[in-house]
């Protein structure tokens, strides 16, 4: 998450200034930064160029979706009772607000999931930083039918 925050915070700087900031990091941090540097995509590119579990920044205009069918899936939450651990399946729609992030040029959209407890995303052009995750329609699916961005940070673009 540190890399996402850093990349988003320096995103408005020109490449020269970005390089100066990155050069100030010690060697270990520079290696970590280069290894986990986010991929920057448009919503229209996310399905074809996105990589599952990769740090990603997507730019577009979010629109809160009310459709519960767009975001069918579950997250397994471990529950410990004494020495016994069981898992509870929680519907993703219960813990996330789901947005369609629209591409200005092609009007294509990509799903992003934003924590329900957080402030709503503005309906204006923003950069959303997070991790790409797979969205399986059911747990028996081998390959995910869709991807979504689990949003961690966002920044308005003027």
Provide a role label for each language-model segment.
Residues 1-158:
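OB-fold and OB-like single-stranded nucleic-acid-recognition modules
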């Amino acid at each position: 998450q540190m890399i996402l925050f850093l990349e988003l915070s320096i995103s408005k700087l020109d490449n020269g200034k970005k390089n100066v900031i990155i050069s100030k990091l010690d060697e270990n941090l520079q290696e970590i930064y280069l290894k986990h540097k986010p991929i920057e995509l448009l919503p229209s590119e996310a399905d074809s160029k996105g990589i599952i579990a990769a740090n990603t920044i997507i730019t577009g205009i979010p629109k809160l979706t009310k459709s519960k069918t767009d975001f069918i899936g579950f997250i397994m939450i471990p529950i410990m009772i004494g020495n016994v651990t069981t898992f509870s399946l929680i519907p993703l729609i219960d813990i996330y607000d789901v947005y369609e992030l629209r591409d200005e040029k092609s009007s294509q959209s990509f799903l992003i999931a934003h924590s329900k407890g957080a402030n709503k995303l503005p309906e204006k052009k923003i950069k959303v930083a997070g991790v790409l995750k797979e969205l399986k329609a059911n747990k028996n699916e081998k390959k995910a039918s869709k991807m979504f961005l689990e949003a961690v940070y966002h920044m308005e673009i003027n």
